[in-house]
Amino acid sequence: MLLKEYRICMPLTVDEYKIGQLYMISKHSHEQSDRGEGVEVVQNEPFEDPHHGNGQFTEKRVYLNSKLPSWARAVVPKIFYVTEKAWNYYPYTITEYTCSFLPKFSIHIETKYEDNKGSNDTIFDNEAKDVEREVCFIDIACDEIPERYYKESEDPKHFKSEKTGRGQLREGWRDSHQPIMCSYKLVTVKFEVWGLQTRVEQFVHKVVRDILLIGHRQAFAWVDEWYDMTMDEVREFERATQEATNKKIGIFPPAISISSIPLLPSSVRSAPSSAPSTPLSTDAPEFLSVPKDRPRKKSAPETLTLPDPEKKATLNLPGMHSSDKPCRPKSE
């Protein structure tokens, strides 16, 4: 297990980011999706927790085979996805990632949002008070991102919001900028496979860090697109974008109808009703079936006639032990 705490500051308030993070997640997922790969939304519905109150539950499938390193692609199926389950009780969220193909792999993320510059060192005392962990600050303006994801229009050093007047962040902006908020993320990665654990857990944390950096940069760079939205408007945007994303990936309906299967209680999320099913059949596939009208191929005569022993001499057939030369014992 490898545990790290990430702190990402934003030139926003926590109340503003409630709309911004929903907008960013939907648009980012749509942009990163393509035919056969991307983020499929399986479930997105209100959810009530006895402790945290009202929230939103989402389940997604993240198809990412081409984004895996070569050493990982060699051991996973071609159609490979990670299941994401998230419980959003903003300003507190829980996100879990699992993979049925890799049962010993999981990512658990707890997120809390506060209006400060990442100065709360006790924010996760209830979750991991005595657990040793590395604290990593992510600077959306100054930290480098992978070159293939860089866009000047999404660079906080160059972008300036027309609606808020915020932007063109410079080194040290977190010390003086107002407003400012921080996303605190406690990330636990587990891959309990001997010989690969350290390598995989470190790799996953690198990917998580890159995604957090890119996503938070985009949330700010897109602020003029979502700043005036209401919650109802961003939920409608979310619904429409998710539908378009599923079509973009190429999600097809299940092979058989499963609508007659009773739904599980909302607290049980292990088998979503939209999971594809495989019809059971004892018949062989058509391409393996032998046509009934095909003539039987004869590779041998239907009857076998043996020679008459009495005619053996006249036919001049050799005996079983006959030989032109006498048999001689092998010399020792």
From Swiss-Prot:
Biased amino acid composition, Low complexity: 267-285
Highest taxon of the lineage: Eukaryota
Keyword tags: Cytoplasm, Lipid transport, Lipid-binding, Phosphoprotein, Transport
InterPro entries: PI_transfer (IPR001666), PI_transfer_N (IPR055261), START-like_dom_sf (IPR023393)
Any single biological process term in GO: phospholipid transport
Pfam families noted in UniProt: IP_trans (PF02121)
A molecular function GO annotation: phosphatidic acid transfer activity
Record's subcellular location: Cytoplasm
Major location category of this protein: cytoplasm
Catalytic activity: a 1,2-diacyl-sn-glycero-3-phospho-(1D-myo-inositol)(in) = a 1,2-diacyl-sn-glycero-3-phospho-(1D-myo-inositol)(out); a 1,2-diacyl-sn-glycero-3-phosphate(in) = a 1,2-diacyl-sn-glycero-3-phosphate(out)
Modified residues (Phosphothreonine): T278
Disulfide bonds, paired cysteine numbers: none
GO cellular component, one term: cytoplasm
Summary of the tissues where the protein is detected: Ubiquitously expressed.
Positions bearing Phosphoserine: S119, S270, S274
Chain intervals for the UniProt region annotation (Disordered): 267-332
Compositional bias segments (type: Basic and acidic residues): 322-332
Listed PANTHER family: CYTOPLASMIC PHOSPHATIDYLINOSITOL TRANSFER PROTEIN 1, PHOSPHATIDYLINOSITOL TRANSFER PROTEIN
Record-stated family: Belongs to the PtdIns transfer protein family. PI transfer class IIB subfamily.
Protein name from the UniProt record: Cytoplasmic phosphatidylinositol transfer protein 1
Protein's organism: Homo sapiens (Human)
